[in-house]
A protein has these predicted regions:
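Internal active-site segments that recognize and position negatively charged phosphoryl groups
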Residues: 1
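Active-site catalytic microenvironments in core metabolic enzymes, especially phosphate/sugar-handling
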Residues: 4-117
Length: 117
């Protein structure tokens, strides 16, 4: 809960393509509901695979209920830089933040939900 309380953005570095352990699903969902308006981004520790939260049931459910943004094929460094810029320069409008997050800058993201592999 400390992370949700203290930070405006949370970057989750998942297992594989976007798996979230089922054991934390309920607690994470409750925190998302309690701290609405936070930017929550799913990244992956797999360097060349990218994220796809629709592969596993828990990830699919969490993406829908917690408004996760996905890194897809962005590197963790790109995700961090974009997130920091968005927090400093963008309003609290989630739709604007999402549009800017998925805007390609210097080929940092090639695949998104609309044009996923």
């Amino acid at each position: 809960e400390y992370v949700f309380e203290k930070y405006d953005a949370i970057i989750v570095e998942s297992f594989g393509v976007g798996g979230i352990p089922i054991t934390i699903r309920e607690k994470f969902f409750a925190l998302c509901q309690k701290y609405q308006g936070k930017m929550i981004i799913m990244a992956t520790q797999v360097a060349h695979e990218g994220s796809d939260m629709t592969v596993y049931e828990v990830g699919h459910d969490m993406k829908a209920s917690c408004n996760f943004l996905e890194s897809y094929d962005m590197t963790l460094e790109s995700v961090i830089a974009k997130t920091m810029w968005l927090l400093a320069n963008c309003t609290d409008d989630a739709a604007s933040r999402e549009k800017l997050f998925y805007t390609c800058i210097n080929h940092d993201i090639l695949f998104t939900g609309a044009n996923q592999r």
